[in-house]
C-alpha cells in the first residue's frame, strides 16, 4: 500500500460513485457512505444494511477491505451489493490507498 497510486485509486473509485458517496457528511446512497471507511466498524453508518453485513464483526481494516473488494459476495454471502469485485491486486491496492485519504485523520499504513 505504501507504493500504491492514489490518483489511480480515485479512477477505480469512479466505478463506485453510482452507489456510494465519498465526501464527508454526504450520507448514504444505494450503498453506505465510504468517507472515513478505513478502520471504521463494519455496518456502523446510517444505512439499511443486509443481514449479511449486519452479521459482520470487526473493522474495515486493510485486510478486510482487500478481501471484500476482491469478491464482495464471497466475503459477505447474501449481500445486496451487486458489484462483482476488483480482481486486479494493483487496482485494489490503489483503491484502498485512495479510500484511506478520505478522512480527516487517515489510518496508519500497515
Which sequence ranges carry the predicted segments?
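Gly/Gly-Pro-rich "capping" loops immediately C-terminal to redox-active cysteine motifs
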Residues: 6-10, 24-62, 80-85
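N-terminal post-signal-peptidase region of extra-cytosolic proteins
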Residues: 1-2, 18-21, 48-49
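The canonical Cys-X-X-Cys-His
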Residues: 13-22, 95-99
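Short phosphate-engaging motifs
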Residues: 18, 26, 91
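C-terminal capping alpha-helices of c-type cytochrome domains
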Residues: 61-110
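Electrostatic cytochrome c docking/interface patches
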Residues: 1-13, 110
